[in-house]
């Protein structure tokens, strides 16, 4: 039996995550208090059906150690994955404003504005976020995008191997919050300054050929490969579910896309479970 624990900021998409898990055959329980989690799992441990539980700010224990200890205990006997969903403050505020719903902290008596509630919740959840196997930033994701991302990540975990996620991004759009490692490639030769290459992306052959002829590009790619290859066994022993590697250039169109694609394809050839995403390209 697999157990998925879904947590995160209110308005970040926990209900969407549960619907996806339900579609994938999971038995889903919404807003289960942490102190009942072990008892609940024990009651259904002989079931062949996978289980997903969402944890809400309203029923989290005041002491983060309780969640940490509960998860550590469950992981000794079950296949447990913790998913944490988050989004930028302004996006969460926008979502609540559009739906005109009350924030959970307002419902339990906190005397604060919506903006203060969002900030307070993130502060409370910071310790819980550290327990997550997978952190997803839903700021720019539609319900469909989030559903597809979750479906891909969850199905990618079926073999119980560590999933390597390579994602390109543009620094001008902000740092990805779900990355374990971030590599800055803005110092590499920029195809943007070649008029014929400017409208293309790092997935196009002319751009790939342009970058591949520069020694520093190949050297950096090989050094990142070597770094990850060296430390991958230790990361796998640490019971991680995902390793997210983000590669950033200025706009997220050329250099980061090329390096990300090359790294992803390299580790696929090594037999690893790999997912490749290009965040800036997904915006258009």
UniProtKB/Swiss-Prot annotation:
Binding site for GTP: 56-59
Binding annotation for ATP: 8-15
Molecular function terms from GO: ATP binding; GTP binding
Disulfide bond entries: none
Sorted UniProt keywords: ATP-binding, GTP-binding, Nucleotide-binding
Annotated HAMAP family: RapZ_like (MF_00636)
NCBIfam families reported for this sequence: PRK05416.1
Entry similarity comment: Belongs to the RapZ-like family.
Function statement: Displays ATPase and GTPase activities.
Name of this chain's protein: Nucleotide-binding protein VF_0384
Organism: Aliivibrio fischeri (strain ATCC 700601 / ES114)
Organism phylogeny: Bacteria, Pseudomonadati, Pseudomonadota, Gammaproteobacteria, Vibrionales
């Amino acid at each position: 039996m697999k157990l998925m624990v879904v947590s995160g900021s209110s308005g970040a998409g926990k209900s969407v995550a549960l619907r996806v898990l339900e579609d994938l055959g999971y038995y889903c329980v919404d807003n289960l208090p942490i102190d009942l989690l072990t008892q609940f799992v024990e009651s259904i441990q002989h079931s062949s059906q996978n289980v997903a539980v969402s944890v809400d700010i309203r029923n989290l224990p005041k002491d983060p150690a309780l969640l940490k200890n509960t998860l550590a205990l469950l992981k000794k006997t079950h296949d447990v994955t913790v998913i944490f969903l988050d989004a930028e403050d302004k996006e969460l505020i926008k979502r609540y404003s559009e739906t005109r719903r009350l924030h959970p902290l307002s419902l339990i008596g906190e005397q604060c504005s919506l903006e203060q509630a969002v900030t307070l919740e993130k502060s409370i959840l910071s310790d819980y976020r550290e327990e997550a196997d997978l952190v997803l930033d839903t700021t720019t994701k539609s319900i469909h995008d989030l559903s597809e991302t979750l479906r891909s990540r969850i199905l990618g975990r079926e073999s119980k191997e560590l999933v390597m996620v390579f994602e390109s991004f543009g620094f001008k759009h902000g740092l990805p919050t779900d990355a374990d490692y971030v590599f800055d490639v803005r110092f590499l030769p920029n195809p943007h300054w070649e008029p014929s290459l400017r409208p293309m992306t790092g997935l196009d052959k002319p751009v790939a050929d342009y970058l591949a002829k520069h020694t520093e590009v190949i050297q950096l790619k090989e050094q990142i490969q070597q770094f990850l290859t060296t430390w991958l066994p230790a990361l796998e022993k640490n019971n991680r579910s995902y390793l997210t590697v983000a590669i950033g250039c200025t706009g997220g169109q050329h250099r980061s896309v090329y390096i990300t694609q090359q790294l992803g394809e390299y580790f696929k050839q090594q037999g690893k479970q790999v997912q490749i995403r290009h965040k800036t390209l997904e915006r258009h």
